[in-house]
Amino acid sequence: MDFDSAGVRLHYELHGPEDGPPIVLVHGFASDYQLNWVGTRWQETLTKAGHRVIGLDCRGHGSSDKPHDPAAYALEIMAADVRRLLGHLHIETANYLGYSMGAKIGLQAMVDFPKRVGRVVLGGIGWGGAFRAAQEIAKALRGGPIESPVAKTFYDFAKGRASNDLEALAACILGPQPEPDSAALAKITNPVLVVVGDEDDIVAEVDRFIEHLPTAKLVTIAGRNHMSAVPAGEFKKAALEFLEA
């Protein structure tokens, strides 16, 4: 299914009981709903637990439109896509699960429209991370030299998905996505669960991030990196317990 978000066509999916508590799932950079949440059995886990899953393909990804202008990927714009999706579905408030880029979008959602999101699970996020290497990643995606391990990780991941538009992904990584604002984080009142693998070398300064987010609880998954943390059973267990608290 598709909807219009201020002139950009975005794809979404609905799964699970119609009367279940709604939860929006937002994937990471160069991924999409199917890759991030279906193959990893998150959709199955949440729907079996009675949740109404709303899966979004972010702009630039999956089956959604793929603009080539970095300005189209400002964090506020990508968060507004989530708000418009809730409006399209006539949902006043929904829980939220986001990973990596999707976690940054969820963070922005709590700043911009906190009453539209309930309990929020943020995975694979810290104070900085891959977006600090945006220029290197974009250069690699555009066929230039690979100048860092982070750029190689994201280039290999992006190239591995035939549906990816590498120019759109380069625009996305170059979009206006500043580091968290400590004053804005301090005002967040939504309950937040942060989940990070202890071998994640993509995110940075997780402890600093948690210190500035007073409502957050941190769960660290042993032996998992940025990619392998997503399907971890410990991640699913912690998220379900948090969502159903």
Task: Report the location of each language-model feature.
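Short beta-strand/loop motif that positions the catalytic acidic residue
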Residues: 188, 194-196
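Short alpha-helix in the alpha/beta-hydrolase fold that links the catalytic acid
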Residues: 39, 190, 203-211
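Catalytic histidine-centered segment of alpha/beta-hydrolase-like enzymes
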Residues: 224-236
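Catalytic histidine neighborhood in serine/cysteine hydrolases
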Residues: 210-227
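Conserved HGGG/HGGXW glycine-rich cap/lid loop of the alpha/beta-hydrolase fold
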Residues: 8-65
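Conserved hydrolase catalytic core segment
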Residues: 92-130
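Active-site loop/oxyanion-hole signature of alpha/beta-hydrolase fold enzymes
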Residues: 38, 44-48, 55-95
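Active-site nucleophile elbow and catalytic-triad environment of alpha/beta-hydrolase enzymes
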Residues: 168-184, 199-201
